[in-house]
Protein backbone atom coordinates (compact mmCIF):
# COMPACT_ATOMS: atom_id res chain seq x y z
CA UNK A 1 0.00 0.00 0.00
CA UNK A 2 2.75 2.43 0.89
CA UNK A 3 4.14 2.17 -2.63
CA UNK A 4 1.24 4.42 -3.62
CA UNK A 5 3.11 7.24 -1.95
CA UNK A 6 5.29 7.50 -5.03
CA UNK A 7 2.19 8.09 -7.13
CA UNK A 8 1.20 10.82 -4.70
CA UNK A 9 4.59 12.47 -5.08
CA UNK A 10 5.65 12.01 -1.48
CA UNK A 11 9.28 11.11 -2.06
CA UNK A 12 11.68 11.60 0.81
CA UNK A 13 13.42 14.95 0.66
CA UNK A 14 16.74 13.15 1.01
CA UNK A 15 16.06 11.67 -2.42
CA UNK A 16 15.44 15.04 -4.01
CA UNK A 17 18.01 17.13 -5.81
CA UNK A 18 17.14 20.43 -4.16
CA UNK A 19 19.88 22.91 -3.36
CA UNK A 20 21.15 23.51 0.16
CA UNK A 21 18.16 25.85 0.65
CA UNK A 22 15.69 23.01 0.02
CA UNK A 23 14.60 22.54 3.61
CA UNK A 24 12.87 25.90 3.87
CA UNK A 25 9.80 23.76 4.66
CA UNK A 26 10.07 20.09 5.68
CA UNK A 27 6.36 19.23 5.60
CA UNK A 28 6.83 16.70 2.79
CA UNK A 29 9.57 14.92 4.73
CA UNK A 30 7.59 14.84 7.98
CA UNK A 31 4.38 13.63 6.33
CA UNK A 32 6.30 10.90 4.52
CA UNK A 33 7.83 9.76 7.82
CA UNK A 34 4.51 9.84 9.65
CA UNK A 35 2.54 7.81 7.11
CA UNK A 36 5.41 5.34 6.70
CA UNK A 37 5.89 4.77 10.43
CA UNK A 38 2.16 4.21 11.06
CA UNK A 39 0.07 2.90 8.18
CA UNK A 40 -3.07 4.16 9.96
CA UNK A 41 -1.91 7.71 9.30
CA UNK A 42 -1.55 6.88 5.61
CA UNK A 43 -5.05 5.40 5.46
CA UNK A 44 -6.51 8.39 7.31
CA UNK A 45 -4.79 10.90 5.01
CA UNK A 46 -6.03 9.06 1.93
CA UNK A 47 -9.62 8.83 3.21
CA UNK A 48 -9.71 12.46 4.33
CA UNK A 49 -8.40 13.70 0.98
CA UNK A 50 -11.02 11.62 -0.86
CA UNK A 51 -13.84 12.98 1.33
CA UNK A 52 -12.56 16.52 0.85
CA UNK A 53 -12.60 16.17 -2.92
CA UNK A 54 -16.14 14.75 -2.75
CA UNK A 55 -17.32 17.65 -0.58
CA UNK A 56 -15.81 20.16 -3.00
CA UNK A 57 -17.54 18.57 -5.97
CA UNK A 58 -20.89 18.70 -4.16
CA UNK A 59 -20.47 22.27 -2.91
CA UNK A 60 -18.74 23.98 -5.81
CA UNK A 61 -21.54 26.52 -6.26
CA UNK A 62 -22.36 27.15 -2.61
CA UNK A 63 -21.93 30.61 -1.09
CA UNK A 64 -19.06 30.70 1.40
CA UNK A 65 -19.16 32.40 4.77
CA UNK A 66 -15.95 33.50 6.45
CA UNK A 67 -14.74 30.79 8.84
CA UNK A 68 -13.19 31.79 12.17
CA UNK A 69 -10.31 29.68 13.51
CA UNK A 70 -9.23 30.10 17.18
CA UNK A 71 -5.45 30.17 17.47
CA UNK A 72 -2.96 29.97 20.31
CA UNK A 73 0.66 30.99 19.79
CA UNK A 74 3.15 29.12 21.99
CA UNK A 75 6.40 31.06 22.37
CA UNK A 76 9.10 28.59 23.47
CA UNK A 77 12.08 30.79 24.29
CA UNK A 78 15.57 30.40 25.69
CA UNK A 79 15.76 30.80 29.46
CA UNK A 80 18.32 33.55 28.96
CA UNK A 81 15.72 35.64 27.12
CA UNK A 82 13.69 36.54 30.20
CA UNK A 83 12.20 39.81 29.01
CA UNK A 84 9.38 39.82 26.48
CA UNK A 85 10.77 41.27 23.26
CA UNK A 86 14.25 39.86 23.89
CA UNK A 87 15.62 37.40 21.30
CA UNK A 88 13.51 34.26 21.05
CA UNK A 89 10.97 35.69 23.52
CA UNK A 90 9.41 37.79 20.79
CA UNK A 91 7.11 40.70 21.55
CA UNK A 92 3.32 40.75 21.47
CA UNK A 93 3.65 43.31 18.68
CA UNK A 94 5.61 40.86 16.51
CA UNK A 95 3.05 38.12 17.18
CA UNK A 96 0.13 40.42 16.32
CA UNK A 97 1.97 41.51 13.17
CA UNK A 98 2.36 37.87 12.06
CA UNK A 99 -1.35 37.15 12.49
CA UNK A 100 -2.28 40.42 10.77
CA UNK A 101 -0.26 39.39 7.71
CA UNK A 102 -1.71 35.87 7.85
CA UNK A 103 -5.25 37.24 7.72
CA UNK A 104 -4.39 39.65 4.93
CA UNK A 105 -2.91 36.79 2.89
CA UNK A 106 -6.02 34.65 3.37
CA UNK A 107 -8.41 37.48 2.50
CA UNK A 108 -6.53 38.89 -0.51
CA UNK A 109 -6.08 42.20 1.28
CA UNK A 110 -2.28 41.93 1.39
CA UNK A 111 -0.26 44.91 0.20
CA UNK A 112 0.28 43.42 -3.28
CA UNK A 113 -3.42 43.82 -4.16
CA UNK A 114 -5.18 45.15 -6.12
CA UNK A 115 -2.06 45.76 -8.27
CA UNK A 116 0.44 42.92 -7.70
CA UNK A 117 4.02 43.13 -9.01
CA UNK A 118 2.86 41.12 -12.02
CA UNK A 119 -0.72 40.42 -13.12
CA UNK A 120 -0.16 37.15 -14.99
CA UNK A 121 -2.50 35.18 -12.73
CA UNK A 122 -4.55 38.02 -11.27
CA UNK A 123 -7.84 36.45 -12.37
CA UNK A 124 -7.00 33.27 -10.43
CA UNK A 125 -6.22 34.98 -7.11
CA UNK A 126 -8.73 34.07 -4.39
CA UNK A 127 -10.09 35.40 -1.12
CA UNK A 128 -10.01 32.18 0.94
CA UNK A 129 -12.48 33.55 3.53
CA UNK A 130 -10.79 31.98 6.54
CA UNK A 131 -9.82 34.24 9.45
CA UNK A 132 -7.46 33.39 12.31
CA UNK A 133 -8.23 34.97 15.70
CA UNK A 134 -6.55 34.83 19.09
CA UNK A 135 -8.34 32.64 21.62
CA UNK A 136 -9.63 34.49 24.69
CA UNK A 137 -10.52 31.35 26.64
CA UNK A 138 -8.27 28.34 27.16
CA UNK A 139 -9.22 24.66 27.33
CA UNK A 140 -10.59 25.08 30.85
CA UNK A 141 -12.57 28.23 30.10
CA UNK A 142 -10.03 30.51 31.77
CA UNK A 143 -9.19 33.92 30.27
CA UNK A 144 -6.20 34.06 27.91
CA UNK A 145 -4.76 36.45 25.37
CA UNK A 146 -4.01 33.57 22.99
CA UNK A 147 -0.28 33.57 23.75
CA UNK A 148 1.69 31.25 26.03
CA UNK A 149 5.33 31.75 26.96
CA UNK A 150 7.57 28.87 28.01
CA UNK A 151 11.19 29.17 29.11
CA UNK A 152 13.45 26.30 28.04
CA UNK A 153 17.06 25.29 28.58
CA UNK A 154 17.21 24.21 24.93
CA UNK A 155 19.42 26.45 22.82
CA UNK A 156 17.58 25.50 19.62
CA UNK A 157 15.64 22.68 17.95
CA UNK A 158 17.00 20.53 15.12
CA UNK A 159 14.08 19.86 12.72
CA UNK A 160 15.75 16.68 11.47
CA UNK A 161 15.79 15.00 14.89
CA UNK A 162 13.61 17.18 17.17
CA UNK A 163 10.81 18.31 14.87
CA UNK A 164 8.12 17.80 17.52
CA UNK A 165 10.03 18.19 20.78
CA UNK A 166 8.94 21.82 21.24
CA UNK A 167 5.36 20.49 21.42
CA UNK A 168 5.85 18.58 24.68
CA UNK A 169 6.49 19.76 28.24
CA UNK A 170 8.69 16.75 28.97
CA UNK A 171 11.07 17.53 26.09
CA UNK A 172 11.58 21.17 26.98
CA UNK A 173 8.67 22.57 25.01
CA UNK A 174 5.01 23.35 25.60
CA UNK A 175 2.06 20.96 25.38
CA UNK A 176 -0.42 22.09 22.75
CA UNK A 177 -4.05 22.81 23.49
CA UNK A 178 -6.84 20.55 22.19
CA UNK A 179 -6.14 20.46 18.42
CA UNK A 180 -9.83 19.95 17.70
CA UNK A 181 -10.66 23.33 19.24
CA UNK A 182 -7.50 25.38 18.61
CA UNK A 183 -4.87 25.81 15.92
CA UNK A 184 -1.59 25.49 17.82
CA UNK A 185 1.33 27.57 16.52
CA UNK A 186 4.74 26.97 18.10
CA UNK A 187 7.34 29.71 17.60
CA UNK A 188 10.90 28.82 18.61
CA UNK A 189 14.54 28.83 17.53
CA UNK A 190 15.03 26.25 14.76
CA UNK A 191 18.62 25.15 14.25
CA UNK A 192 20.40 27.06 11.48
CA UNK A 193 23.20 24.98 9.89
CA UNK A 194 26.44 26.94 9.38
CA UNK A 195 26.39 26.05 5.67
CA UNK A 196 22.95 27.66 5.28
CA UNK A 197 19.63 26.20 4.22
CA UNK A 198 17.76 26.42 7.52
CA UNK A 199 14.16 25.32 7.98
CA UNK A 200 11.74 28.22 8.38
CA UNK A 201 8.69 26.19 9.37
CA UNK A 202 6.55 23.09 8.85
CA UNK A 203 3.20 21.47 9.56
CA UNK A 204 1.28 18.29 8.69
CA UNK A 205 -1.33 17.49 6.06
CA UNK A 206 -4.85 16.72 7.35
CA UNK A 207 -4.92 13.17 8.73
CA UNK A 208 -1.19 12.54 8.58
CA UNK A 209 -0.88 12.61 12.40
CA UNK A 210 -4.34 11.23 13.20
CA UNK A 211 -2.80 8.69 15.58
CA UNK A 212 -0.52 11.23 17.25
CA UNK A 213 -2.65 14.37 17.32
CA UNK A 214 -0.40 16.13 19.82
CA UNK A 215 1.85 16.88 16.83
CA UNK A 216 -0.90 18.70 14.93
CA UNK A 217 -0.34 22.39 14.24
CA UNK A 218 2.57 24.32 12.81
CA UNK A 219 6.07 25.34 13.84
CA UNK A 220 7.71 28.59 12.70
CA UNK A 221 11.18 29.90 13.45
CA UNK A 222 11.03 33.11 15.49
CA UNK A 223 13.13 34.94 12.87
CA UNK A 224 10.41 34.43 10.24
CA UNK A 225 7.24 35.16 12.23
CA UNK A 226 5.78 38.48 11.11
CA UNK A 227 7.81 41.36 9.69
CA UNK A 228 9.12 42.95 12.89
CA UNK A 229 12.77 42.08 13.51
CA UNK A 230 12.80 39.21 11.01
CA UNK A 231 15.48 38.01 8.59
CA UNK A 232 15.83 38.43 4.82
CA UNK A 233 15.17 37.08 2.27
CA UNK A 234 11.96 35.47 3.64
CA UNK A 235 10.95 38.61 5.52
CA UNK A 236 7.53 39.18 3.95
CA UNK A 237 5.84 37.48 6.91
CA UNK A 238 4.18 34.76 4.81
CA UNK A 239 5.92 31.70 6.28
CA UNK A 240 2.87 30.95 8.52
CA UNK A 241 0.64 31.36 5.45
CA UNK A 242 2.60 28.65 3.60
CA UNK A 243 2.52 26.26 6.56
CA UNK A 244 -1.19 26.73 7.23
CA UNK A 245 -1.71 25.99 3.54
CA UNK A 246 -0.26 22.53 4.24
CA UNK A 247 -2.27 22.26 7.47
CA UNK A 248 -5.44 22.83 5.42
CA UNK A 249 -4.54 20.35 2.67
CA UNK A 250 -2.30 22.08 0.12
CA UNK A 251 0.91 20.72 -1.38
CA UNK A 252 3.86 22.59 -2.87
CA UNK A 253 3.32 23.97 -6.35
CA UNK A 254 6.78 22.91 -7.57
CA UNK A 255 7.64 19.35 -8.58
CA UNK A 256 9.11 17.15 -5.84
CA UNK A 257 10.12 14.26 -8.12
CA UNK A 258 13.44 13.44 -9.78
CA UNK A 259 14.52 11.22 -12.63
CA UNK A 260 16.80 8.19 -12.40
CA UNK A 261 19.87 10.40 -12.49
CA UNK A 262 18.69 12.59 -9.64
CA UNK A 263 17.69 15.52 -11.85
CA UNK A 264 14.50 17.56 -11.36
CA UNK A 265 11.62 16.74 -13.69
CA UNK A 266 8.35 18.38 -14.63
CA UNK A 267 5.16 17.41 -12.85
CA UNK A 268 1.91 18.94 -11.62
CA UNK A 269 2.69 18.41 -7.94
CA UNK A 270 -0.77 19.14 -6.51
CA UNK A 271 -2.85 17.45 -9.23
CA UNK A 272 -3.51 14.24 -7.27
CA UNK A 273 -5.80 13.00 -4.52
CA UNK A 274 -3.72 14.29 -1.61
CA UNK A 275 -3.16 17.60 -3.39
CA UNK A 276 -6.86 18.10 -4.05
CA UNK A 277 -6.57 17.79 -7.85
CA UNK A 278 -5.78 21.50 -8.01
CA UNK A 279 -5.93 22.35 -11.72
CA UNK A 280 -5.36 26.11 -11.64
CA UNK A 281 -1.69 25.96 -10.60
CA UNK A 282 0.54 25.17 -13.61
CA UNK A 283 3.17 22.45 -13.63
CA UNK A 284 6.68 23.56 -12.71
CA UNK A 285 10.08 21.94 -12.36
CA UNK A 286 12.10 22.15 -9.15
CA UNK A 287 12.22 25.28 -6.98
CA UNK A 288 12.52 28.98 -7.81
CA UNK A 289 14.13 30.96 -4.98
CA UNK A 290 14.19 34.47 -6.43
CA UNK A 291 11.91 37.47 -6.41
CA UNK A 292 8.81 37.77 -8.59
CA UNK A 293 7.99 40.89 -10.59
CA UNK A 294 6.71 41.93 -14.01
CA UNK A 295 9.88 40.68 -15.72
CA UNK A 296 9.89 37.20 -14.10
CA UNK A 297 9.31 34.76 -16.95
CA UNK A 298 10.14 31.25 -15.69
CA UNK A 299 8.39 28.58 -17.75
CA UNK A 300 9.94 25.26 -16.86
CA UNK A 301 7.18 22.90 -18.09
CA UNK A 302 4.82 22.69 -21.06
CA UNK A 303 1.37 22.99 -19.48
CA UNK A 304 -0.32 21.54 -22.55
CA UNK A 305 1.15 18.18 -21.52
CA UNK A 306 -0.98 18.09 -18.36
CA UNK A 307 -4.65 17.84 -17.52
CA UNK A 308 -5.39 21.26 -16.06
CA UNK A 309 -7.40 24.44 -16.59
CA UNK A 310 -4.90 26.00 -18.98
CA UNK A 311 -5.44 25.90 -22.75
CA UNK A 312 -2.04 27.39 -23.43
CA UNK A 313 1.48 27.04 -22.09
CA UNK A 314 1.71 29.52 -19.21
CA UNK A 315 4.48 30.79 -16.95
CA UNK A 316 5.28 29.13 -13.62
CA UNK A 317 3.14 30.51 -10.79
CA UNK A 318 6.10 31.61 -8.69
CA UNK A 319 3.94 34.13 -6.77
CA UNK A 320 1.87 31.36 -5.17
CA UNK A 321 2.08 31.06 -1.38
CA UNK A 322 2.89 27.34 -1.76
CA UNK A 323 6.05 28.04 -3.77
CA UNK A 324 9.50 28.88 -2.37
CA UNK A 325 9.89 32.30 -4.02
CA UNK A 326 11.20 35.06 -1.79
CA UNK A 327 8.06 37.16 -2.32
CA UNK A 328 4.64 35.59 -2.80
CA UNK A 329 1.11 36.95 -2.70
CA UNK A 330 -1.70 34.61 -3.80
CA UNK A 331 -3.73 31.44 -3.40
CA UNK A 332 -5.85 30.24 -6.34
CA UNK A 333 -9.58 29.53 -6.39
CA UNK A 334 -9.05 25.78 -6.33
CA UNK A 335 -6.55 26.03 -3.50
CA UNK A 336 -9.19 28.04 -1.63
CA UNK A 337 -11.69 25.28 -2.36
CA UNK A 338 -9.36 22.65 -0.89
CA UNK A 339 -8.84 24.64 2.31
CA UNK A 340 -12.54 25.38 2.73
CA UNK A 341 -13.27 21.70 2.17
CA UNK A 342 -10.85 20.85 4.98
CA UNK A 343 -12.53 23.37 7.30
CA UNK A 344 -15.94 21.86 6.53
CA UNK A 345 -14.65 18.30 6.85
CA UNK A 346 -11.66 17.04 8.79
CA UNK A 347 -11.11 20.31 10.66
CA UNK A 348 -14.78 21.24 11.10
CA UNK A 349 -14.38 21.03 14.89
CA UNK A 350 -12.20 24.16 14.63
CA UNK A 351 -14.95 25.91 12.70
CA UNK A 352 -17.40 24.98 15.46
CA UNK A 353 -14.99 25.46 18.36
CA UNK A 354 -16.57 26.70 21.61
CA UNK A 355 -13.47 28.83 22.30
CA UNK A 356 -14.07 32.57 22.51
CA UNK A 357 -11.83 34.64 20.25
CA UNK A 358 -10.56 38.15 19.67
CA UNK A 359 -10.09 39.15 16.03
CA UNK A 360 -8.79 42.65 16.68
CA UNK A 361 -5.40 41.86 18.26
CA UNK A 362 -4.34 40.59 21.65
CA UNK A 363 -5.72 41.75 24.99
CA UNK A 364 -3.71 41.74 28.21
CA UNK A 365 -4.75 38.67 30.18
CA UNK A 366 -5.19 40.74 33.35
CA UNK A 367 -7.85 42.79 31.56
CA UNK A 368 -10.07 39.86 30.55
CA UNK A 369 -13.44 39.26 32.21
CA UNK A 370 -14.42 35.61 32.71
CA UNK A 371 -17.71 33.68 32.88
CA UNK A 372 -18.03 34.44 36.58
CA UNK A 373 -18.28 38.15 35.78
CA UNK A 374 -20.05 38.39 32.42
CA UNK A 375 -22.30 35.74 30.87
CA UNK A 376 -23.39 35.98 27.22
CA UNK A 377 -26.10 33.57 26.02
CA UNK A 378 -27.71 31.77 24.20
CA UNK A 379 -25.03 30.85 21.70
CA UNK A 380 -25.87 30.01 18.94
CA UNK A 381 -28.83 32.39 18.93
CA UNK A 382 -31.87 32.84 16.72
CA UNK A 383 -31.75 36.59 17.21
CA UNK A 384 -31.82 37.65 20.85
CA UNK A 385 -28.71 37.66 23.03
CA UNK A 386 -28.70 38.22 26.78
CA UNK A 387 -25.73 39.75 28.59
CA UNK A 388 -25.79 39.06 32.30
CA UNK A 389 -23.64 41.18 34.60
CA UNK A 390 -22.93 38.77 37.44
CA UNK A 391 -20.64 41.03 39.45
CA UNK A 392 -22.51 44.36 39.07
CA UNK A 393 -19.55 45.70 37.08
CA UNK A 394 -20.09 49.43 36.48
CA UNK A 395 -20.11 51.35 33.21
CA UNK A 396 -20.61 48.53 30.73
CA UNK A 397 -19.98 49.37 27.08
CA UNK A 398 -21.27 46.83 24.56
CA UNK A 399 -20.13 46.66 20.93
CA UNK A 400 -21.28 44.14 18.31
CA UNK A 401 -18.91 43.66 15.36
CA UNK A 402 -19.08 41.59 12.20
CA UNK A 403 -16.25 39.33 11.04
CA UNK A 404 -14.57 42.29 9.32
CA UNK A 405 -14.36 44.13 12.62
CA UNK A 406 -16.98 46.68 11.55
CA UNK A 407 -19.21 48.00 14.33
CA UNK A 408 -22.82 46.87 13.85
CA UNK A 409 -24.40 47.89 17.14
CA UNK A 410 -23.45 49.70 20.35
CA UNK A 411 -25.04 49.96 23.77
CA UNK A 412 -24.25 51.39 27.19
CA UNK A 413 -26.02 49.97 30.22
CA UNK A 414 -25.70 49.66 33.96
CA UNK A 415 -28.42 47.03 34.14
CA UNK A 416 -27.56 43.58 35.42
CA UNK A 417 -29.28 42.02 32.39
CA UNK A 418 -29.12 43.47 28.88
CA UNK A 419 -31.02 42.11 25.89
CA UNK A 420 -29.66 42.61 22.36
CA UNK A 421 -31.79 42.03 19.28
CA UNK A 422 -29.71 40.72 16.35
CA UNK A 423 -32.65 39.34 14.39
CA UNK A 424 -32.31 42.02 11.70
CA UNK A 425 -28.78 40.85 10.86
CA UNK A 426 -27.80 38.15 8.38
CA UNK A 427 -26.89 34.69 9.65
CA UNK A 428 -23.22 34.32 10.44
CA UNK A 429 -20.53 34.98 13.03
CA UNK A 430 -20.48 38.12 15.17
CA UNK A 431 -18.35 39.31 18.07
CA UNK A 432 -19.74 40.95 21.20
CA UNK A 433 -17.29 43.11 23.15
CA UNK A 434 -18.33 43.93 26.71
CA UNK A 435 -15.93 46.39 28.34
CA UNK A 436 -15.93 48.12 31.69
CA UNK A 437 -13.57 49.69 34.18
CA UNK A 438 -12.64 46.15 35.26
CA UNK A 439 -11.71 44.73 31.86
CA UNK A 440 -13.14 43.34 28.62
CA UNK A 441 -14.96 40.20 27.48
CA UNK A 442 -15.07 39.20 23.80
CA UNK A 443 -17.49 36.48 22.77
CA UNK A 444 -17.94 34.87 19.36
CA UNK A 445 -21.68 34.47 18.74
CA UNK A 446 -23.27 32.49 15.92
CA UNK A 447 -26.53 33.88 14.55
CA UNK A 448 -28.64 31.10 13.01
CA UNK A 449 -32.25 32.17 12.48
PLM region spans:
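N-terminal zymogen propeptides
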Residues: 20-66, 106
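Fold-level signature of zinc-dependent metallopeptidase catalytic domains
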Residues: 55-103, 187-192
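A recurrent domain-boundary module in secreted/ectodomain proteins
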Residues: 332-367
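Hydrophobic h-region of N-terminal signal peptides that target proteins for export
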Residues: 10-18
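Metzincin-family zinc-dependent endopeptidase catalytic domain
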Residues: 100-294, 298
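C-terminal outer-membrane/trafficking sorting elements
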Residues: 368-449
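Sec-dependent signal peptide recognition
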Residues: 3-10
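Solvent-exposed, polar/charged alpha-helical surfaces in well-ordered, non-transmembrane soluble domains
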Residues: 93-100, 104, 238, 320, ...
Amino acid sequence: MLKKLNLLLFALLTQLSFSQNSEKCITTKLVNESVTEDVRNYIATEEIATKNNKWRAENSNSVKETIIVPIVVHIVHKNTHVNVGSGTNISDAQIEDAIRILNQDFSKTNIEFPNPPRNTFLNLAADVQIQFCFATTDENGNPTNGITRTSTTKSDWDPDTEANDMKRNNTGGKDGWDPEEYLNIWVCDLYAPPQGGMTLGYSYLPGSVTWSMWKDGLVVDYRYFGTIGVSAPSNDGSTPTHEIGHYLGLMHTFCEEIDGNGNPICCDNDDNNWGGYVDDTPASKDVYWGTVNASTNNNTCNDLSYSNNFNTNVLDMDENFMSYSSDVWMFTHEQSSVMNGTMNGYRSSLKNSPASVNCTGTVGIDNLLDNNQIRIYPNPTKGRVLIQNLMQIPNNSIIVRNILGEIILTSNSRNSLVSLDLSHLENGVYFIDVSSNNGIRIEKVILAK
